[in-house]
């Protein structure tokens, strides 16, 4: 299984990337490989600059990136089960079952969460739209979750019990997304 993650800037440590070696072959798209295990395949930056770091995830859909079966994981996820159950050929993301729909606003909140994604056929159209409309996208959209959902790109969603948000689940999920204030 090929795991893919993104590490830009100093927010997250190399140890968070290295922990994924326990689960499969690891690829890391990063601007700083210091401290990463030699067993991790480093993907060099494409040269795009984003004020909002989350947008570096969209570079993963560039035609220049490897077109292989990947399971993408944010660095701060907790893993409790068999990651193979999350592998999908079509672009798949979690639906945020744990969020109240009353939290949604037109632009800033979404029912998607890109903390976990899987694909074989990467959604190049998402990357191309961003590159061709960069000023609009980076001005208008506060993150990639609402951008992907509101722009109506094609995606599938995981079944509810597979991915949960910390403290929101009754049955232990395979992946647990952590609260922002606990990400280190």
Protein language model regions, located:
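Short amphipathic alpha-helix with an adjacent loop that forms part of the alpha/beta core around
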Residues: 62-64, 86
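N-terminal anchoring/stem segment of glycosyltransferases
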Residues: 1-52, 65-66, 121
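Catalytic core and acceptor-binding pocket of nucleotide-sugar-dependent glycosyltransferases
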Residues: 116-184
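Glycine-rich, basic loop-to-helix element that forms the pyrophosphate-binding segment
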Residues: 53-60
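Short, polar loop motifs at secondary-structure junctions
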Residues: 27-36, 75-83, 163-166
């Amino acid at each position: 299984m090929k795991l893919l993650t993104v590490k830009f800037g100093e927010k997250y440590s190399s140890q968070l990337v290295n922990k994924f070696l326990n689960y499969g072959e690891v690829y890391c798209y990063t601007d700083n490989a210091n401290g990463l295990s030699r067993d991790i395949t480093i993907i060099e930056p494409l040269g795009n600059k984003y004020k909002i770091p989350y947008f570096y995830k969209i570079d993963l859909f560039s035609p220049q990136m490897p077109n292989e079966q990947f399971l993408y994981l944010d660095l701060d996820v907790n893993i409790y089960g068999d990651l193979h159950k999350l592998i999908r050929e079509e672009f798949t993301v979690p639906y945020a079952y744990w969020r109240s729909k009353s939290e949604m606003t037109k632009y800033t909140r979404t029912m998607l969460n890109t903390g976990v994604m899987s694909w074989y056929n990467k959604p190049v159209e998402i990357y191309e739209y961003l590159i061709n409309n960069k000023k609009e996208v980076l001005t208008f959209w506060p993150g990639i979750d609402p951008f992907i959902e509101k722009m109506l790109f094609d995606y599938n969603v995981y079944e509810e019990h597979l991915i949960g948000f910390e403290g929101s689940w009754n049955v232990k999920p395979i992946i647990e997304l952590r609260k922002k204030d606990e990400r280190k």
